[in-house]
Amino acid sequence: MLDYLKIRRDLHQIPEIGLEEYKTHAYLMQVIEGLTADLDFVEIRTWRTGILVFIKGSSPYKTIGWRTDIDGLPIVEETGLDFASTHEGRMHACGHDMHMTVALGLLEQALSAQPNHNLLFLFQPAEENEAGGMLMYEDGAFGDWLPDEFYGLHVRPDLKVGDIATNRGTLFAGTCEVKLTFKGKGGHAAFPHEANDALIAASYFITQVQTIVSRNVDPIEGAVVTFGSLHAGTTNNVIAETAFLHGTIRTLTQEMNLLTQKRLREIAEGIAQSFDLELDLELKQGGYLPVENHPDLAGELMDFFQKEDGVELIDIAPAMTGEDFGYLLSKVKGVMFWMGVDSPYALHHPKMTPDEAALPFAIEKIGKFLDYKVNER
C-alpha cells in the first residue's frame, strides 16, 4: 500500500512551474510504473511532462476520466515545514501536491481489479500558467482515450476535512489576462505641450474601465475587472512616455467574458485615439473557461456523497477563481468539486498548509465513487 504522507511530502519538496515539471514527472512515473507492473489491462502514455494512465475495462461502453494537476507556483514558501520546498522561489501553494497524492491513491485502488468500463487518469501539467489541459487536447494527446465523463477536485482551505462542495452549474469563473501599454512621447515636466503623457491616459482608462461592471454587466450575472499593476514614468519631473497595465477579467459565463473583453478593448482604443497614443493590447484567455458542471452528472455525484457516512456535502455558490479544467469540461461533460483541507491560509498564500487528514478521506470516499462509475451496468 502506498504511503500517502510520504508521497505528498516528497512532492511538496519539488514544486515546478508548468511544462517544467521534470522531477515531478519522474517521481510520478516511478510510482505509476510500480503500481502497474505486469498488469496487461493498463497502458501509459506521456505528453511532455504530462502522463496518461489508461485502465482497459473488461466490457466497456464508456471511459471515465479522473484529472489532477501537477504544477507549482512561483512563490517563496513560508510554512516552516520540515518538508518545505527545496526549489528556491517555488511552492505547492495551491495544493497540487495533495491533488497528485489523491490521484495516485485512487489509481492504486482502481488497479486492484479490472473494472467493467475504461478508466483514464490524467496527470496534467501547467494548470497555473499555460492551460495544460487545452494544450494536451489540441495536440491530440488523448487520442482514442478521451473520456466520456471527466471528474476532478480542488482543495479548499476554508472548508474542513470531510467537506465536499460543488453545484449543478458553474463552479469556477472564466478568466482572461489583460496586458496593455499606452505609448506617447516623454518630455520635461516644464514643457508638457511638447510631450504626450501616457500616465494621464492610463489614469483615464482605469477610471472608465470600471463602468464595464457597473453599466455593461447584468448585475445578476456579475463580473470582475481588476488591474493590479500599473507602471509608468521614471521620476517626478519627467512626463511618462509609456504606461503599462496588467489586469484580469473574471466572469461566470463565457458570453459575459467575451462581452467584457469587447468593452475593455473599445475603451482602450477610445482612450488611445482621444489622447493620440499608440496602443498595444493583449487579451489572453486561452483555456481558462468557466468550469461548468454537467447538471445531471453533478446531481449524481452529489447524491452519492450525500449518502456517504463521514461526508458533509455542500451545495456551494460559484467562486471567481479560475481553473483550466473548464476547457476540458467544455469538450467532455463532467464535474469538478471542492475538497476541504482546513487551513487558515488561502490558496496561493506562502503559508498555505493543508491538513493531511484529507488524504485518506479523499482516497476512500472518491475511490468508492469511481468504483461505482466504472462498474455500473
Swiss-Prot record:
Q: What GO molecular-function term can you cite, just one?
A: N-acetyldiaminopimelate deacetylase activity
Q: What pathway or pathways are given for this protein in its record?
A: Amino-acid biosynthesis; L-lysine biosynthesis via DAP pathway; LL-2,6-diaminopimelate from (S)-tetrahydrodipicolinate (acetylase route): step 3/3
Task: Give the Gene3D superfamilies listed for this entry.
Answer: 3.30.70.360, Zn peptidases
Q: Give the EC number(s) under which this enzyme is classified.
A: 3.5.1.47
- Enzyme active site: 69, 128
Name the InterPro entries for this protein.
AcetylDAP_deacetylase (IPR023905), Amidohydrolase (IPR017439), Bact_exopeptidase_dim_dom (IPR036264), Peptidase_M20 (IPR002933), Peptidase_M20_dimer (IPR011650)
Catalytic reaction annotation = N-acetyl-(2S,6S)-2,6-diaminopimelate + H2O = (2S,6S)-2,6-diaminopimelate + acetate
The question of whether Flavoprotein is a record keyword is answered with no
Alphabetically list the UniProt keywords: Amino-acid biosynthesis, Diaminopimelate biosynthesis, Hydrolase, Lysine biosynthesis
Q: Does the keyword Transmembrane helix apply?
A: no
Protein purpose: Catalyzes the conversion of N-acetyl-diaminopimelate to diaminopimelate and acetate.
NCBIfam families attached here? amidohydrolases
Q: Which PANTHER family match?
A: N-ACETYLDIAMINOPIMELATE DEACETYLASE, PEPTIDASE M20 FAMILY MEMBER
Which family does the record claim for this protein? Belongs to the peptidase M20A family. N-acetyldiaminopimelate deacetylase subfamily.
> In its UniProt entry, what is this protein called?
N-acetyldiaminopimelate deacetylase
User: What is the species of this protein?
Assistant: Streptococcus gordonii (strain Challis / ATCC 35105 / BCRC 15272 / CH1 / DL1 / V288)
